[in-house]
């Protein structure tokens, strides 16, 4: 098993991943912290064991990259043959997901439009959006100016009517 040196944290499964796995597997069971730590250590040791065996199989077949087949052979040689069917299912699911991702990323490439043309179209759309934004700002400014003018006219009108009322009162006082 791995020693408890400072570099071991880099060689273990993240604790959050183990906690999630435990919750999904045993949703109604409380698991003590030391039991969680034991699960982390067991998982880490299992991965080291399988990867070491897969590496040996890879080296024997004079390959430089460990393939899924090497991992499957390692499971078999270490006595974990009962896991192989499930491992193959998960491998197929992973390949399907990877293929979907590649297809999604290549959609842009398959449009048949060169990247320069796409960038030009994007710049046109940005320019159009800036123009629309400027027009909206101009309209808002004009509306504010009109509102200010109307407020000034209303204030001037009120002031004029107040002055006219004052003049009338003075004339009435003169008549007395």
From Swiss-Prot:
InterPro entries, per database record: CBFA_NFYB_domain, Histone-fold, Ncb2
An annotated GO BP: RNA polymerase II preinitiation complex assembly
Phosphoserine PTM sites in chain numbering: 105-106, 166-167
Pfam families: CBFD_NFYB_HMF
Repressor recorded as keyword: yes
Record-annotated Histone-fold domain positions: 12-75
Location of this chain's protein in the cell: Nucleus
Keyword DNA-binding carried by entry: yes
GO cellular component, one term: ATAC complex
Start-end of Low complexity biased regions: 152-167
Post-translational modification: Phosphorylation regulates its interaction with TBP. Not phosphorylated when bound to DRAP1.
Keywords: Acetylation, DNA-binding, Nucleus, Phosphoprotein, Repressor, Transcription, Transcription regulation
Motif Nuclear localization signal: where in chain: 100-103
Residue ranges that the Swiss-Prot or TrEMBL entry lists as coiled coil: none
A GO term, aspect molecular function: RNA polymerase II general transcription initiation factor activity
Transmembrane regions: none
Region (Disordered): 152-176
Residues with PTM N-acetylalanine: 2
Subunit structure: Heterodimer with DRAP1. DR1 exists in solution as a homotetramer that dissociates during interaction with TBP and then, after complexing with TBP, reassociates at a slow rate, to reconstitute the tetramer. Interacts with NFIL3. Component of the ADA2A-containing complex (ATAC), composed of KAT14, KAT2A, TADA2L, TADA3L, ZZ3, MBIP, WDR5, YEATS2, CCDC101 and DR1.
Protein family: Belongs to the NC2 beta/DR1 family.
Function: The association of the DR1/DRAP1 heterodimer with TBP results in a functional repression of both activated and basal transcription of class II genes. This interaction precludes the formation of a transcription-competent complex by inhibiting the association of TFIIA and/or TFIIB with TBP. Can bind to DNA on its own. Component of the ATAC complex, a complex with histone acetyltransferase activity on histones H3 and H4.
UniProt protein name: Protein Dr1
Gene that specifies this protein: DR1
